[in-house]
Amino acid sequence: MAIVLVPNVQMSHLVSEWSVPAVRQFSLSLARSHRLIRYDSTGSGLSPSASPRFDLESLAADIPALLDGLALDRAALFGNITGGLPAMTFAAANPGRVSHLVLWNSFARNTDHGANPRLTSLFAMAATDWELFTESISQAALGWRDSEAARGWAATLRAATEPVSFHRYLAERQSWDVTDLLAHIQCPTLVLFDPTNRLASEERSRELAAAIPNATFMRATSESGMPDAPTIALIEQFLRDAKTATFDRPPGGLSLREVDVLRELATGATNAEIAERLSISINTVARHLTHIYVKTGSSNRVEAVRYAERRELVD
């Protein structure tokens, strides 16, 4: 099974966070049994952007870009804190592409998290003393019991972003709210709450689980802010035992994404328009079209659309 780790927005850096032992333990443990996919969201870490956008739709667009680039129809998603919101956004809109959803210390609305008095005061500090802010928010989450890991997370935050980008993120996340999407999430969902994280809320996690149709809430244990060995075992059991929704497979061996491209093709859209609508690159569209032509026995766009019409893939 492929698992995509959807990162805590503006707080991930693939190289820097590897210095935190708990990150390595968590990642390597899952990678023993699964195809693990780690990434930095656009605008942070190793995915810099001159003009990053932090609305949920833009953040969620990273997920299909990864799946398409790796030729994956479907994957499980692990949403890490704020990363849970783009994960839920994608899962609600693309039920056929998400097999399981794991939410770690996540929430449904910015007001559930960003309005936390402790966080509010910490975010205010970011405008006046960036280094002190990074140290303080890491220490606030983990407590003084784990100062070495907190320093590692603070260094990761400084590597992940810069003050200008972080303040833009804080402004855009004010409108974050996936409440209306939760009922549309069809996959089995595991909502995990770590009581040692002082910036998370058990009440909000329970509300989240109650609003998702096929969700289970569990209190969990952690190591330096990440799931520890017992919780990793719990996640593994969930991925193994939870029944996933079944979806009819497209004809001709077409992937779900290729069907998406074919449907856009039937509207008369150009490659550039398809790329924009599906949030993928033009090169990815061209690659999908090549596969579509081979699988449908078509030599051009018109023949491919006729195939789709015969197979009732388009209206």
Q: What annotation goes with each model-predicted range?
A:
Residues M1-P48:
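Conserved HGGG/HGGXW glycine-rich cap/lid loop of the alpha/beta-hydrolase fold
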Residues E57-A75:
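Conserved acidic catalytic loop of the alpha/beta-hydrolase fold
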Residues M88, A92, V98-A127:
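Flexible "cap/lid" loop of the alpha/beta hydrolase fold
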Residues R151-D180, H184:
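Hydrophobic, aromatic-rich cap/lid helix
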Residues I185, V191-F193:
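Short beta-strand/loop motif that positions the catalytic acidic residue
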Residues R198-R204:
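Conserved alpha/beta-hydrolase "acid-adjacent" motif
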Residues A215-G253:
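Catalytic active-site module of serine/aspartate enzymes centered on a nucleophile-bearing elbow/loop
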Residues F247-T290, V294-T296, E303-R306, R310-D315:
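Helix-turn-helix DNA-binding segment
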